[in-house]
Amino acid sequence: MSAAFYQDEVKFYVAVDCIILGFNNKELNVLLYKRSFESMKGQWSLMGGFVKSGESVNEAASRVLTDCTGIEHLFMEQIGAYGDVSRDLGERVISVAYYSLVNMNDFSPEILESHNATWTKISELPDLIFDHNQMINDTLSVLKKKAASRPIGFNLLPEQFTLPQLQTLYEAIYQTPLDKRNFRKKLNAMDILEKLDIKDKKSSKRGAFLYKFNEKKYNKWVEQGFDFSL
């Protein structure tokens, strides 16, 4: 196809925006930063960047995630493309959004400081630039659907955790209290947890037994799915 075919078409930018979610034992948090450049300088934004020459959209998202977290090969999944004509006040930009689930304890303060970034509770989100609030809302909707058919938690929780911590994570995702008995019945049916001979005594004198995921069984359910609707 000749170059003239492309010359008559409008040129625009392609960007990626990353919804980086973490869990602090109580609530879901998202990583935000204040923009240091125009347009909308000084306002809160998701982590993102433009797709560079010679890289795919997936590679761009992976690069942004590694740069913003200092962690390689993070789980990520595409949410969708956002291309409203007037979404960016600077130029015509189409953005492809990805979400990633991370353990907040893996982040160093230096990484956050270098990007002027901070963890913000989902329940306390400020007004973000462009359509970034919509991207987060769409991510939460996807996460709820995923939680109903796939195990979630491996990327968000520490290696060892209590059952109350795991239930609190699901309650944060579903944004509603869950019945303890029904929740544990579902977990037992999946058989993805290994009980450890260690107790966490931070929350009570008796303490709660710690568990860890059986990675092989966990990945099996990730691949084939499971009815975990609560």
Where are the regions that the model predicts?
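Long, intrinsically disordered, low-complexity Ser/Thr/Pro-rich regulatory/activation regions
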Residues: D197-L230
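Core subunits and conserved enzymes of cellular information-processing
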Residues: M1, F5, F23-N25, V30-L31, ...
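Short histidine-centered catalytic/ligand-binding loop motif
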Residues: L46-G54, N155-L156
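RNA substrate-recognition surfaces in RNA-acting enzymes
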Residues: L178-F209
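Short helix-coil junctions and helix-kink-helix linkers
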Residues: T168-P177
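N-terminal strand-loop-strand
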Residues: Y6-W44
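NUDIX/MutT-family hydrolases
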Residues: Y99, P109-L143, A147, L156-P164, ...
